[in-house]
Every structure is written in structure tokens, then in C-alpha cells.
Regions:
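Arginine residue identity/basic-tract feature
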Residues: 26, 46, 54, 66, ...
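Metal-dependent phosphoesterase core characteristic of DEDDh/y 3'-5' exonuclease domains
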Residues: 1-5, 24-133, 140, 311-341
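Acidic two-metal-ion nuclease catalytic site recognized across multiple nuclease folds
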Residues: 128-263
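Conserved DEDDh/DEDDy metal-dependent 3′-5′ exonuclease domain
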Residues: 2-81, 239-252, 260-293, 300-303
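A general structural signal for short secondary-structure junctions and capping/turn motifs
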Residues: 23-24, 113, 179-184
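Non-catalytic terminal regions of proteins
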Residues: 203, 209-341
Length: 341
């Protein structure tokens, strides 16, 4: 952007958000996909919608799903690191920035970092994966919502989880905990056991010892962030990677069945997770959090949604009066700021 573009814009910020929300609702239900959007674009959009008295979770509710092109690219590299040509950084790791990937694979990228052009680049980069590693693409399209991730996890004895650490895309062979205790007791993310570890070592540990072991790295309990579009693949992929390739299929199956069959152990893991989460909450000071930063601290009650819709439909004078109808003080403050601006 430049000064001219900003000063001659057709919309105010309030009007722009209204147009975005209207367009997204018209497209819905849809899969909202970008490149590195889960941790950047989506977060920015959610916070702006939240401050704008709109639905912050529009892109992953009411039948909508999310996926991230970067997640798909990383998973594709974990399966086959020759899927695309890449640059390498000073640490020798593959560079997965959109512009770099496009340029290295013969895609014109001189207009990169323009929003519309980046969307076009994302399409072209992902088309290569769609054509050359379709199983990864199809797997990604099956985990675009929390419900899909949970259903997949419940129905599979074990599977390959793709994670990205310190510039490396890795595959982990995991089995979800017993279904009653599969979700984190606080955050509701899927919890799975890493089959590189022998589960019997942990079965009889007292709770305090179990918590100590769970805090060590590498972790034997892996968190699958169900609402962040993880890419989950068939167990064959991780079983061919180290360290799982050194184990027999029978050994891995035995470990998976031991986890699924030990309801008591899974219950104690769940209890340990709850206590660890509470300990972190107790040591965290949230007294200085601003209303804008509180989006994940306290969700807006559903009964406020019709009030927000009515507020947007009202004229500016009536908007001031309607602020008294909100029970959530954050919404009152946001409304005052919108009127002032």
C-alpha cells in the first residue's frame, strides 16, 4: 500500500469489515485456504471481526472449514522431500516461503506479496501437490474442521501426524488415547501417544511421576491441534521413517493396542494434562489483558449475536442507545470505539 491508496480508499475500516463478512457469508459453506493463514491472516481477521462486533469464527463455523497451504506443503515434503525444488537457508533447511517455492519451481513470482497475486501463487504451488502427491491433498481436505479431526482420530488405530520443528518437517506415528479421554480436558485438542516409546514403561507410574515424564522432551504424548487444520496421513508413511522403521509392524501394532486398551492409563494422562494446564494458568498474570486481547480468554456468549446483528442494522444515533443492550462489557467498549471513529 501507499499514502495515495490509503487516503483514497473507498471504504472506512467499519465498511470494509462489513463487506468482507457479507462476502464470506455469501461464499459459505466453503473451505477457507491461504498460505500461512492459520497463524497469521486468520488471527488478524478474527481479532478485527471481534473488535468490529462481528463473528470472529466465521471461517470455521456454520459448515465452513479451514486449511493452510503451508501445512499441506510441509506434509508433502515430509512424505517426499523431492516434491519441489527449494532454496536452503544458512542452517541447511528447505525454505518454504511462498515466493521462494514459486520461483524455484518455474512460477512467475515478481508480483509476490500483493494479496491477489499471492492467492494466485498459492493456487499454482498447491496444484503441483494436487497432481503429484494427491493423497496428501486429499488427506488435508479431510481435516479442515475440529469435528473432522476428532472423527478421523476416533476411527483410526494409528496414523501419521505431520509436525514442523526447527525448520524440519517430520512424521510421527501415533495412536489416539482411549476415546473417552482422547481430548485435552481443557483445550479439547486430540491427545495421542507417540509409538516410538514403550507405553508399558508409563502405565504404573504415580501421577506426579507421570506428570514429570510428560514434561520431558521428546514428548510421548503429542497434541494434535484439531482446530488448526493438521494434516493426518496413513500410518504407512511414518512407519517407514526413523525411528519407527527400526521396529516391526507387530511391535507397533502391539503398542497401539496397549494404549487403546488401557482406559485407566488414558484417564490418568487426562488428569495429568488438566493439572499441568491449571499450573500454567495459576502462574500466568492476565490482569493487564486488554479487551482486544481477550478473544480467547473469554468467548462471546451466543445470546449476544442477535444483538450485534441488530446493532449493525441500526442508524448511528440508535447504535449509541443499543450499546446498553450488551451484557459483555467488551462489546460495549468496541461499539463506542466504532462510533467515535
Amino acid at each position: 500500500s501507499n499514502v495515495s491508496m490509503l487516503t483514497k480508499a473507498n471504504y472506512s475500516h467499519y465498511q470494509m469489515l462489513q463487506e468482507i463478512e457479507t462476502t464470506f457469508k455469501r461464499w459459505s459453506p466453503a473451505v477457507f485456504l491461504g498460505y500461512s493463514n492459520i497463524n497469521f491472516d486468520d488471527e488478524m481477521l478474527r481479532k478485527e471481526f471481534f473488535k468490529g462486533l462481528r463473528q470472529p469464527y466465521l471461517t470455521n463455523t456454520n459448515g465452513n472449514k479451514r486449511q493452510d497451504g503451508l501445512n499441506i506443503v510441509r506434509a508433502a515434503f515430509a512424505v517426499n522431500d523431492k516434491i519441489m525444488k527449494t532454496e536452503t537457508n544458512e542452517k541447511g533447511n528447505a525454505v518454504m516461503k511462498l515466493e521462494s517455492l514459486a520461483r524455484m519451481n518455474g512460477i512467475e513470482s515478481s508480483g509476490a506479496h500483493n494479496a491477489l497475486f499471492d492467492a494466485h501463487l498459492t493456487k499454482l504451488v498447491l496444484e503441483k501437490i494436487y497432481k503429484e502427491q494427491n493423497i496428501t491433498w486429499r488427506s488435508a481436505m479431510m481435516t479442515g474442521s475440529r469435528e473432522e479431526v476428532e472423527n478421523f482420530s476416533r476411527n483410526e488405530l494409528m496414523f501419521s501426524l505431520n509436525e514442523y520443528f526447527y525448520g524440519k518437517s517430520k512424521l510421527y506415528l501415533v495412536t489416539p488415547l482411549y476415546h473417552e479421554h482422547m481430548l485435552h480436558p481443557i483445550y479439547k485438542w486430540v491427545q495421542a501417544f507417540d509409538l516410538r516409546f514403550d507405553p508399558e514403561i508409563y502405565f504404573d507410574l504415580p501421577l506426579d511421576e507421570l506428570k514429570k515424564e510428560m514434561k520431558k522432551t521428546p514428548k510421548f504424548i503429542r497434541t494434535i491441534r484439531s482446530n488448526k487444520a493438521p494434516v493426518l496421513l496413513h500410518s504407512d508413511y511414518a512407519s517407514k521413517a526413523e525411528p519407527y522403521s527400526a521396529m516391526t509392524k507387530e511391535q507397533l501394532l502391539k503398542r497401539a493396542k496397549l494404549i487403546k486398551g488401557n482406559k485407566d492409563f488414558c484417564a490418568r494422562v487426562s488428569l495429568a494434562l488438566a493439572e499441568i494446564a491449571q499450573e500454567k494458568r495459576d502462574t500466568g498474570d492476565q490482569s493487564d489483558i486488554t479487551p482486544e486481547e481477550s478473544i480467547y480468554v473469554k468467548f462471546v456468549d451466543n445470546k449476544e449475536t442477535p444483538k450485534m446483528e441488530k446493532w449493525h442494522q441500526a442508524g448511528w444515533e440508535d447504535k449509541i442507545k443499543l450499546l446498553d443492550k450488551f451484557e459483555d462489557e467488551r462489546l460495549v467498549e468496541f461499539g463506542k470505539k466504532i462510533i467515535y471513529q
